[in-house]
Amino acid sequence: MSSYRPYQSIERRKSRQIHVGKVPVGGDAPISVQTMTNTLTTDAEATIAQIRRAELAGVDIVRVSCPDEESTAALAEIVREVNVPIVADIHFHYKRAIEAAQAGAACLRINPGNIGSAERVREVVKAAREHGCSIRIGVNAGSLEKHLLEKYGEPNPDALVESALEHAKILQDHDFHEFKISVKASDVFLAVAAYQQLAEVCDHPLHIGITEAGSKRAGTVKSSIGLGNLLWAGVGDTMRVSLSADPEEEVLVGWDILKSLGLRHRGVKIISCPSCARQGFNVIQTVQTLEERLAHIQTPLTLSIIGCVVNGPGEALMTDIGVTGGGSGRHMVYAAGRQDHTVPADSMIEHIVELVEKKAEILRAEEAAAKAEAEAALAPAQ
């Protein structure tokens, strides 16, 4: 990623590209955001509704647990009714993997080592190949193989990486290369070290995450430290923020991490002050309201909400639209970094929403025009 501010540049690790349904993973593809449903998969209606909420939040890929035959039986309806590729989460039962592939799963999350015999692994790979499924090798510090625990004494980076490479070799021995790898741990130090080590010894796309990260607040902090560290170093091709919360919350946090590092852009990025006695309006309440009112906008743009003139004008220089608290019940509105007009306090929120929606519409039109112009330039001459 290039920038005229070199301190903002992140050079991503070069990796092979695979596909999870229509979503490319690895190579120069955008870093995709994932989540996992926490409904009973057999309750297809509830699972579909949850996935649709995650879609509205911006999810790219959704994982669904398939612990039994009834779950894989429900998978076909789920796949049919949603707009994002579905990863079937499989453990131990190789037949569930085959059934999930037949039901339309775009990817199978397995550990080849716990599927069973070489013949069973061969059957799973055959089903994946026939149905266009990729595979995710999911190594976890909490379920490492016995021989690795005996060798290393405890889950450590070497053990996680060795497990991942052993499983990768199983797939490669079957001439199957459409796979990605994860080496997750709940300990941030362990997870980051394992991913860094794995990134140095292979070019497979990496699914990054801090597993069992915790509650919404604690898990967000933990994941931001771990995933932010990896992404800043260029490691990671797809990601999931694991929270004990609704799946759409995981998606929103994932997007915020990517937006903070300039790796992807979606929706309105609000820059706001923590507020103090100098604030000309209630900053905290205003930001909360605007986040809700502007959640439907997907066009990337920036909005600064600053309570006073100490930092307000400076922040507005770097945003598409800005508001700075003033006196006498009126506040200054900035457009493209310049003072533009004032707005009465009692109509400020409605006014900002209107400005942002209009700006988003202009940006969408400009993007569409640029795309049409580029396509016309590539079209053969008549």
Curated annotation (Swiss-Prot):
Designated gene of the protein: ispG
Originating organism: Gluconacetobacter diazotrophicus (strain ATCC 49037 / DSM 5601 / CCUG 37298 / CIP 103539 / LMG 7603 / PAl5)
Name listed for the protein in its UniProt record: 4-hydroxy-3-methylbut-2-en-1-yl diphosphate synthase (flavodoxin)
Role of this protein: Converts 2C-methyl-D-erythritol 2,4-cyclodiphosphate (ME-2,4cPP) into 1-hydroxy-2-methyl-2-(E)-butenyl 4-diphosphate.
Pathway: Isoprenoid biosynthesis; isopentenyl diphosphate biosynthesis via DXP pathway; isopentenyl diphosphate from 1-deoxy-D-xylulose 5-phosphate: step 5/6
Superkingdom of origin organism: Bacteria
Gene3D superfamilies, A to Z: Dihydropteroate synthase-like, Sulfite Reductase Hemoprotein, domain 1
EC class: oxidoreductase
Entry keyword Iron-sulfur: yes
Keywords linked to the UniProt accession: 4Fe-4S, Iron, Iron-sulfur, Isoprene biosynthesis, Metal-binding, Oxidoreductase
Entry EC no(s): 1.17.7.3
Family: Belongs to the IspG family.
Cofactor(s) recorded in Swiss-Prot or TrEMBL: [4Fe-4S] cluster
A single BP term in Gene Ontology: terpenoid biosynthetic process
Cofactor binding, note field: Binds 1 [4Fe-4S] cluster.
GO molecular function: 4 iron, 4 sulfur cluster binding; 4-hydroxy-3-methylbut-2-en-1-yl diphosphate synthase activity (ferredoxin); 4-hydroxy-3-methylbut-2-enyl-diphosphate synthase activity (flavodoxin); iron ion binding
